[in-house]
């Protein structure tokens, strides 16, 4: 699968300057992005005079960057694997050297005009002429980030900054020679990558973007799973998905579910226990599908059952004005007779 993806990306010349690897977990997204970045570095190093080719000063340095939500994660994930990959390549060993550190070594291309670095904020890309970058969107809570919304805004700022630098610096004859790789597993419907892709597609500006979004059973080798499958009905914000019972897995019933607005998946039977045990997690991790509100502390299903036109708002004012030194409490603005 990934060989075909890489062929699709690079056989189109410089058509794609933004590449997004999303979908299920544990399918090789980061490793593929690293392989693509190594190839981008190889192409850049094969130019006789990269600075002259792109019309830059002789002293200009081009950058290969690795970004994550924190600098420690940026250094410890893709950046580390990238350097480990180059370490076993005879070609890269013949055309560059590695730093002397045994544990934290990094690659130094010959000529000293190409820099390989990592970062986590837009400021880490300032003043750099970024030729290629991997943005690996990790789990915010695992990274110790409490303000998720602020982290997403920071990530969008970083993404836009790097994308602008790639397109502005390495555009020639109407083509962008650099690439930005964004790697992210599905988590929730309001994730940074999920929202960004949707906005690009809705605005009709997605021609320059390549998106790989597949479930595990379409990416991993066929022999990994059983050939027998089962049906999963995928809902939306208003309809909760479920595993279709075996005694209802006939054509007419599946067609009726499609008519009701459900999407139908056919995972291998090996995955049935995971979907039955925790449907939302299996849908996210195995199928690479995020359901609106499914992973919140309060699910959309529990909210929907409480919606009614009979109840009235117990607060007469939408905004409560309570000063720091007031003796008023929120309860005093609550009119319980509205809901009784």
Regions found by a protein language model. Give the residues of each.
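Phosphate/NTP-binding elements of NTP-utilizing enzymes
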Residues: 1-340
């Amino acid at each position: 699968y990934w060989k075909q993806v890489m062929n699709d990306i690079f056989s189109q010349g410089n058509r794609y300057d933004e590449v997004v690897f999303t979908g299920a977990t544990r399918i090789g997204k980061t490793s593929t992005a690293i392989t693509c970045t190594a190839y981008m570095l190889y192409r850049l190093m094969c130019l006789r005079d990269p600075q002259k080719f792109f019309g830059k000063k002789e002293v200009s340095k081009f950058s290969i960057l690795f970004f994550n939500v924190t600098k420690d994660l940026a250094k410890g994930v893709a950046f580390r694997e990238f350097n480990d990959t180059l370490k076993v390549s005879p070609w890269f060993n013949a055309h560059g050297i590695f730093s002397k550190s045994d544990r934290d070594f990094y690659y130094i291309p010959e000529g000293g005009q190409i820099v390989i670095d990592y970062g986590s904020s837009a400021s880490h890309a300032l003043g750099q002429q970024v030729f290629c970058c991997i943005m690996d969107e990790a789990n915010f809570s695992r990274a110790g980030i409490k303000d998720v919304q602020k982290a997403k805004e920071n990530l969008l700022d970083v993404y836009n900054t790097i994308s602008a630098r790639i397109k502005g610096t390495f555009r020639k004859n109407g083509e962008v020679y650099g690439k930005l790789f964004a790697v992210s597993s599905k988590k929730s419907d309001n994730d940074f990558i999920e929202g960004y892709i949707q906005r690009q597609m809705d605005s009709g500006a997605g021609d320059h973007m390549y998106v790989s979004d597949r479930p595990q059973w379409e990416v991993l080798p066929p022999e990994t799973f059983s050939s027998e499958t089962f049906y999963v009905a995928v809902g939306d914000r208003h309809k909760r998905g479920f595993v279709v019972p075996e005694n209802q897995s006939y054509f007419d019933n599946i067609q009726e579910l499609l008519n009701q607005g459900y999407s139908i998946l056919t995972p291998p039977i090996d995955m049935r226990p995971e979907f039955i045990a925790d449907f939302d997690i299996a849908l996210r991790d195995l199928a690479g599908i995020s359901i609106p509100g499914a992973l919140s502390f309060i699910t959309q299903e529990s909210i929907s059952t409480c919606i009614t036109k009979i109840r009235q708002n117990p607060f007469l004012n939408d905004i409560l004005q309570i000063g720091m030194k007031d003796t008023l409490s929120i309860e005093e603005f609550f009119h319980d007779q509205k809901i009784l």
